[in-house]
Amino acid sequence: TATATEINVLDGALKENNSLWIGNDPSSTTDNALNSVAFGKTALDAITTGDYNTAFGYDALTNQTTGNNNVAIGYEALRDNSTTSQNVAIGMSALQESNAAGNVAIGANAMRGTTSTAITGGENVAVGSSALKLNIGGASNTAIGKASMGNNTDGNYNVAVGKGSLNDNTEGSNNTTVGYLSANTGTNDITTGENNTLIGASTAASAAAGTNQTVIGYGSSGQANNSVTLGNADVTAVYMAQDAGATVYAAGMVLGGTSVTSTAAEINIIDGGTSATSTTIVAADRVVLNDNGTMKQVAMSDVATYVGSISSLESLYDAKSGGTNFTESLLIGHETTGTLNAAEYN
């Protein structure tokens, strides 16, 4: 067998303008294409003026004509890209249907797109098998993990980290989900919701269209729009600044189902850091009492009713008023039992 001194003498190979093709010879169109490398049957075989492209694998960048600085490694990677630039596709069918710029897809079927609609959204990052698989117009998304954001079509500026994270989102934007199946538990999976932050495996929003919910902790679920949820239903204590304590600012509180939404003076009843001004007590006012270890609110009208129900001072400790052999008499601060013989009007 003769030794080849030039690559061009090999069947299905071409060296031209600092470019190299092995596996096919597209010499009829490559006169103005510079500094590219292709390895594989039909890899980069339609190029005309595009430069600095790299294609490895059958049908990799096969429709590229004028785009520059693309890297496609794997069967049908960046297959339908034709005129756009600065894409990286590594893995079987990664960015297969794309004709957008600035995307990075690593993993089989990562950002693959659909056969009916070309990918137009750019500047996305998809790492993991089927990550951002069905994306079409969505832009500036980051999906890391198998099937993360797999059903996104037009949502923008989302970040999903973890297997299946934010998988059911289609059009929601500005969401951040971190953790295995975060926002993808099968209950209230985010689809169109926006501005949500879910951190922890199996975290969920309160609704598929939930908005501005912050949910932190394994298995925790958002409760409402514009709310923060810390921990799941098994959490029994929440510490601020570890065990040192911290100042918590809030316009109101709900304690055991009872709302406290008034002034700082009325909220801060423990240390008295803010003093309430004196006021005239009315029947509708309420006081806080300890009922056998449980703090309860009692209306002043109820206090008045109780005090009024006391018919004698015997309810007080070391006190006696009236009674047999003690007519119209009052004794306070002394033994009240024993013999009280005809002690009247004392």
What does each of the following model-derived ranges do?
Residues T1-G12, A251-K320:
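Fibrous stalk/shaft segments of extracellular and virion attachment machinery
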